[in-house]
């Protein structure tokens, strides 16, 4: 399987290198769908200029990246294009090996449940085979590397790509069962963009599964392991933040990065849900509604943990999608990360209800973004309502798509234990309805 992966990597790097050398690179780097005030390469360059002059990069209201990122590019500024191509390649490789190991765990668990007669007798067609799962890791790498969203993000040199790499390595180390490395990469991802904090719960649930520790409030082993993992995570985060202070000799980065993410002061249009509402809102209402909007990312973690505690990797997939939809400054690079997981759930396609319509909605919206932006900003024949309407449609399409996957997953799990052909009490055919 190594040769096909290398081929995919070569094709992906070639496409990116060609686009970097084309006239499209400058155009892509300015697209509001691809970069945000947090991830814009131009803002990184401005921060580097201030740093070279001996001025704090956070002294203005332009740079909002983390100190480790600015010091990374302080030394690698001349190789920025190569750094972003390597970053994408590392993300794909990490996802490839993560899903390869995950499939082994899934098949082993499925085999055990079959031996214990935990499945209904008429669900043979729902059982996954090694041949069916063989090419899934390669498809995941393919979906990530050749996704137009990922390519655009790389060519624009959006720092979202680095965040995706950290999350991918968090997933890999979690599936490998390394609690220490998992905590470190989760801390790095949280340090980079704050929202990956919500991935702590699915990561912990998976590691508990690997240790055969039951998720029970009365279990001493559960609390001991949870405390150890939490301490490794918090300790890593504290070390990273202290290192940032050591580099800058200042705490200015905390309000400039995390305060900026949470308070949403820059209302530059993007593909998110925040900017239009707060541009139209009176200032004295904004704090309340910022809290309401921000809580969406964190609110679903507990109910999802309760419902999907036996399936932490699917929980992780849903949570990454929730972050991509509800974060304050999303870009298409965030969307590309959870889309890479679609091949992992290819066994759910038969249960998806609206996959064709929702796919069409997302594709059409992606094509209309630059059109409506041009009509609004350059032609003057449209206004912000047009652009926000397509943004809202895009996000509703994502929400419905993820909801469809969630429904399909629960439906398949129900069929596995209760049988594929359900009957009502009177013997007639029954239909499964999710409420």
UniProtKB/Swiss-Prot annotation:
Effect upon mutating residue 283 to A: No effect on function in GPI-anchor attachment to protein
Top-level taxon of the source organism: Eukaryota
Principal subcellular localisation of the protein: endoplasmic reticulum
Pathway(s) annotated for this protein in UniProt: Glycolipid biosynthesis; glycosylphosphatidylinositol-anchor biosynthesis
Keywords on record: Disease variant, Endoplasmic reticulum, Epilepsy, GPI-anchor biosynthesis, Intellectual disability, Membrane, Transmembrane, Transmembrane helix
Family note: Belongs to the PIGU family.
Disease affiliated with this protein: Neurodevelopmental disorder with brain anomalies, seizures, and scoliosis: An autosomal recessive disorder characterized by global developmental delay, severe-to-profound intellectual disability, muscular hypotonia, seizures, brain anomalies, including thin corpus callosum and cerebellar atrophy, scoliosis, and mild facial dysmorphism.
Name of protein: GPI-anchor transamidase component PIGU
Gene that produces this protein: PIGU
């Amino acid at each position: 399987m190594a040769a096909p992966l290398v081929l995919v990597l070569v094709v992906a790097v070639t496409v990116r290198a060609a686009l970097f050398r084309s006239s499209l690179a400058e155009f892509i780097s300015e697209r509001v769908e691809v970069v945000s005030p947090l991830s814009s390469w131009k803002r990184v360059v401005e921060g580097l200029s201030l740093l070279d002059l001996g001025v704090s990069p956070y002294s203005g209201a332009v740079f909002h990246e983390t100190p480790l990122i600015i010091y990374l590019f302080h030394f690698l500024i001349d190789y920025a294009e190569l750094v972003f191509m390597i970053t994408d390649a590392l993300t794909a490789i990490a996802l490839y090996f993560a899903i390869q190991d995950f499939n082994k765990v899934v098949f082993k668990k499925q085999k055990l449940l079959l031996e214990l007669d935990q499945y209904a007798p008429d669900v043979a067609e729902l059982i996954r085979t090694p041949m069916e799962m063989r090419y899934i890791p390669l498809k995941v790498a393919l979906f990530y590397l050749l996704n137009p969203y990922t390519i655009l993000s790389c060519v624009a040199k959006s720092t979202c790509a680095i965040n995706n790499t950290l999350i991918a390595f968090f997933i890999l180390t979690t599936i490998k069962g390394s609690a220490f490395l998992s905590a470190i990469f989760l801390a790095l991802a949280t340090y980079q963009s704050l929202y990956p904090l919500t991935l702590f719960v699915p990561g912990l649930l998976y590691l508990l599964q690997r240790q055969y520790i039951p998720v029970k409030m009365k279990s001493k082993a559960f609390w001991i392991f949870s405390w150890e993992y939490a301490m490794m995570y918090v300790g890593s985060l504290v070390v990273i933040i202290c290192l940032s202070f050591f580099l800058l000799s200042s705490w200015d980065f905390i309000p400039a990065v995390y305060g900026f993410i949470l308070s949403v002061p820059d209302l530059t249009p993007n593909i998110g849900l925040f900017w239009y509402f707060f541009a139209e809102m009176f200032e004295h209402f904004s704090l309340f509604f910022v809290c309401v909007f921000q809580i969406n990312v964190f609110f679903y973690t507990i109910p999802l943990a309760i419902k999907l505690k036996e399936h932490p990797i699917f929980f992780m997939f849903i949570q990454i999608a929730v972050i991509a939809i509800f974060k304050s400054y999303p870009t298409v690079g965030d969307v590309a990360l959870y889309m890479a997981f679609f091949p992992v759930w290819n066994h759910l396609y038969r249960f998806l209800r609206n996959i064709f319509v929702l796919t069409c909605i997302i594709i059409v919206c992606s094509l209309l973004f630059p059109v409506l932006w041009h009509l609004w900003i350059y032609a003057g024949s449209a206004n912000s309502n047009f652009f926000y309407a397509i943004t809202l449609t895009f996000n509703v399409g994502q929400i419905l798509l993820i909801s469809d996957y969630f429904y399909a997953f629960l439906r398949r799990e129900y069929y596995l234990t209760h049988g594929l052909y359900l009957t009502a009490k009177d013997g007639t055919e029954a239909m499964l309805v999710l409420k």
